[in-house]
C-alpha cells in the first residue's frame, strides 16, 4: 500500500500540495486526475523521491526509506536518454546500475517492434520510438509498482493498445499501477480507482464507479468536468 501522511509541498509562494492524507490500494490501477497545476505530477514524483515534501511522509509497504524504490518501474512523460548510446546499450546500462541480470521484457520489446532499433543510437530515434523505449524500460525487471505519467502520449494507436493491454495485465499479476493522463477515456478504460486533485487538495478518492455515481455522470470525462465545475463554484 502507498500512504501519503500529511504531505505538503510549496514551490516559492505557490502551494502545490496541501496536507495530503491518502492511501492507494495495492493490486489495483489508480488514476491521478485533475486540471493542469493541480499537483498530480508532484504527488507522483514524491513517491519516486524526485520531489521532496516540505512536511509529511510517503510510506510504501510500511517503508519510509528509499529501499522500496528499487521495486518501482517509472515511465516519465518525457524521457531523457544518453543520446550517444544505442537502445541495447541503454538496456544493458540499466541492468548494470540495478545489479539485475534479468533481460528486459523481450515480449514487450517484440510487440513494440523495438528489436529493429536495438543497435540504433537513441539520438536518431523518432519521438514515438523513444516513447516505446520509455515503456520497455518501465516494465523491465518486473516491478511491483508502476508509476506511469502520460504513458500513451506520442504512441500510434497500435502501440497504445499494446501498452494498455500490458498495464491491464499487471493488475492480473497483483501489481500496483499509478497512472496520470489527460485522456480521460483512457483512464476510464484502465482504472479501478481515481484520485481527483484540485488546488493541491484531494477532492475525491475512490472507485471510478463511485465517482460516476456521486456526480451522476456516465463517463469519467463528464464526472471530472462536473467535479471541476463544482470546485470552481465553491
Residue ranges and their predicted role:
Residues 52-68:
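Conserved ABC transporter NBD signature motif
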Residues 48:
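Helix-to-loop junction immediately C-terminal to a conserved catalytic motif
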Residues 92, 96, 102-117:
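Conserved ABC ATPase "signature" region
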Residues 2, 17-19:
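Conserved structural motif at the start of ABC-family nucleotide-binding domains
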Residues 146-150:
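Catalytic Walker B motif of ABC-type/P-loop ATPase nucleotide-binding domains
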Residues 121-128:
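Conserved ABC ATPase signature
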